[in-house]
Each structure stands twice: as structure tokens, then as C-alpha cells.
């Protein structure tokens, strides 16, 4: 079973940014990995394990914003269709090598 945590947290003030970052760190600490920018996923071996992690997400959720949790079976997860567009990375220029005689 897979847990998807999707969230939209305010990040206008310094405090809101801090709380949003703390929430992300708590998700990562609990074994979630970033699937998309505001979507984190985690595999759970059982329903009981999923409920434990749902409790942890609830306890670390900031008071403002929206957090949604979706439970997906392995079969449903295997049917996900990912469409990857071109990813642009900043090209790092190769430094010039100096020759000394």
C-alpha cells in the first residue's frame, strides 16, 4: 500500500515558510520521498503501518493550509502513467585546463 501526501501550505511570511519547511522535513524523516513538489509518497507494508504514518502526518501538519492523504494499493500504484517532459538543467561549463611547462 502506498500513501500519497499532497499539500498546499502558505509561504508568505517568514514563519509560514519555516513551518512549511519543517513539515517537509518531518515527512522525509518519516520515510516519505518527494514525488512532485508538494506530493510525497511512502510505501507501507500493511494497513496498520499506514495508519501509524497517517497519525504522524496529522501531528506534524501546520494549522494553516491544506493536506490531503491518499491510500493506494500496489495494483493501483502500478497503473500510474508518468509522462516526462524535457528537464532543463543549468549547463555547467567545463573549466579551462592550464598547461605548465
Feature roles, as predicted:
Residues 2-4, 9-101:
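Basic nucleic-acid-binding interfaces
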Amino acid at each position: 500500500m502506498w500513501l500519497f501526501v499532497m499539500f498546499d501550505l502558505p509561504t508568505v511570511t517568514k514563519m509560514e515558510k519555516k513551518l512549511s519547511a519543517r513539515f517537509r522535513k518531518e515527512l522525509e524523516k518519516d520515510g516519505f520521498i518527494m514525488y512532485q513538489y508538494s506530493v510525497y509518497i511512502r510505501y507501507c507494508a500493511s494497513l496498520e503501518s499506514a495508519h501509524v504514518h497517517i497519525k504522524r502526518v496529522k501531528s506534524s501538519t501546520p494549522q494553516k493550509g491544506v493536506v490531503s492523504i491518499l491510500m493506494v494499493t500496489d495494483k493501483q500504484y502500478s497503473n500510474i502513467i508518468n509522462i516526462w517532459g524535457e528537464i532543463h538543467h543549468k549547463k555547467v561549463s567545463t573549466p579551462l585546463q592550464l598547461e605548465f611547462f
